[in-house]
From Swiss-Prot:
Modification N6-succinyllysine occurs at: K147, K245, K272
Species this protein is from: Mus musculus (Mouse)
Protein name: ADP/ATP translocase 1
Solcar repeat ranges, renumbered to this chain: 6-98, 111-201, 212-297
UniProt modification remark: Under cell death induction, transglutaminated by TGM2. Transglutamination leads to formation of covalent cross-links between a glutamine and the epsilon-amino group of a lysine residue, forming polymers.
Signal peptide: none
Length: 298
C-alpha cells in the first residue's frame, strides 16, 4: 500500500473513531437542539405541547418518552457521522494539497488563511453529497416524539428511509439539500480553516498542548455553529416536509421557509436551540483534539 493511501486510511480511521465517541456522548443535547428547531414544523407536536426551552425539553423527554429516548436517532447519527467526519478530515487534507501547495504560512498569511477556508468548505460540501440521506433520517428519527412503537412515525433507520422513498422518491431524502450545502460550507470553512490557521501560526504546530488545542477548537466550533445556525434551522424544517401531502406542507421551498419563519416566528426562531448547540459544540471541539491525538498512535 502506498504512503498516500495509508495516510488517507489513517485519516479516515482516526476521524471516524473520534466522531463516533463524541457524538454518542452529546446525543441527548443533540436531540434537545433538534426538537427545539423543528417542533414548529412537526405534525406530532401541537402548539400547546411545544417545548418552552432547553430545560423544559430536558425535563419532559424522559417523562413522556422514556430516558433512553434521549438517544433516539443516535444510531443513525453514528452511522452517518462516521463517514461524514472521516471523509471531511480525509478530503480536507487532499484539498489542502490543492489550495495550499507551496504556500508559506508566515510570508503569505492571507493566502494561507483563504486556502484553509476553501479546503474546509470544499471538504464539508463533498462529503455531504454522499451522506445526506442518513443526515435526513437522523433528523426525522430524533424529531419523532411518539412514546411506543404504535405512536412513533418511524420504527427505525430502515423504516424511515423506506417510507420516505416510497412516498417522495429520492428527492424526499434530499429535502433541504441546497441550503445544507450553503450552511455546511460556512460552518466547515470556519471549523477547519480557522482551526488549522490558528494551530499553524503556533511555534510548534505538531506538538501543541492538548488544553491549548481544545481551547482553540472550542472557540472555533462555537463561532462557526452560531454563524451557520440559521441555515441549519431552515434545512431541518425543510427535512420535516418530506412525506407530507397537500395542506400538511408548510413551506413551498427554501426561500418560502426563510420568509415564513421570519414573518410568523421572528428572527429569534432561526436560533432556537442555539445554546444547546454551543454545548454540543464541546463535542465538536473534542473531535478535533481527539483526531489529532489518535493520529499520533495510528
Amino acid at each position: 500500500m502506498g504512503d498516500q493511501a495509508l495516510s488517507f486510511l489513517k485519516d479516515f480511521l482516526a476521524g471516524g473513531i473520534a466522531a463516533a465517541v463524541s457524538k454518542t456522548a452529546v446525543a441527548p443535547i443533540e436531540r434537545v437542539k433538534l426538537l427545539l428547531q423543528v417542533q414548529h414544523a412537526s405534525k406530532q407536536i401541537s402548539a400547546e405541547k411545544q417545548y418552552k426551552g432547553i430545560i423544559d425539553c430536558v425535563v419532559r423527554i424522559p417523562k413522556e418518552q422514556g430516558f433512553l429516548s434521549f438517544w433516539r436517532g443516535n444510531l443513525a447519527n453514528v452511522i452517518r457521522y462516521f463517514p461524514t467526519q472521516a471523509l471531511n478530515f480525509a478530503f480536507k487534507d487532499k484539498y489542502k494539497q490543492i489550495f495550499l501547495g507551496g504556500v508559506d504560512r508566515h510570508k503569505q498569511f492571507w493566502r494561507y488563511f483563504a486556502g484553509n477556508l476553501a479546503s474546509g468548505g470544499a471538504a464539508g460540501a463533498t462529503s455531504l453529497c454522499f451522506v445526506y440521506p442518513l443526515d435526513f433520517a437522523r433528523t426525522r428519527l430524533a424529531a419523532d416524539v411518539g412514546k411506543g412503537s404504535s405512536q412513533r412515525e418511524f420504527n427505525g433507520l430502515g423504516d424511515c428511509l423506506t417510507k420516505i422513498f416510497k412516498s417522495d422518491g429520492l428527492k424526499g431524502l434530499y429535502q433541504g439539500f441546497s441550503v445544507s450545502v450553503q450552511g455546511i460550507i460556512i460552518y466547515r470553512a470556519a471549523y477547519f480553516g480557522v482551526y488549522d490557521t490558528a494551530k499553524g501560526m503556533l511555534p510548534d504546530p505538531k506538538n501543541v498542548h492538548i488544553i491549548v488545542s481544545w481551547m482553540i477548537a472550542q472557540s472555533v466550533t462555537a463561532v462557526a455553529g452560531l454563524v451557520s445556525y440559521p441555515f441549519d434551522t431552515v434545512r431541518r424544517r425543510m427535512m420535516m416536509q418530506s412525506g407530507r401531502k397537500g395542506a400538511d406542507i408548510m413551506y413551498t421551498g427554501t426561500l418560502d421557509c426563510w420568509r415564513k419563519i421570519a414573518k410568523d416566528e421572528g428572527a429569534n426562531a432561526f436560533f432556537k436551540g442555539a445554546w444547546s448547540n454551543v454545548l454540543r459544540g464541546m463535542g465538536g471541539a473534542f473531535v478535533l483534539v481527539l483526531y489529532d491525538e489518535i493520529k499520533k498512535y495510528v
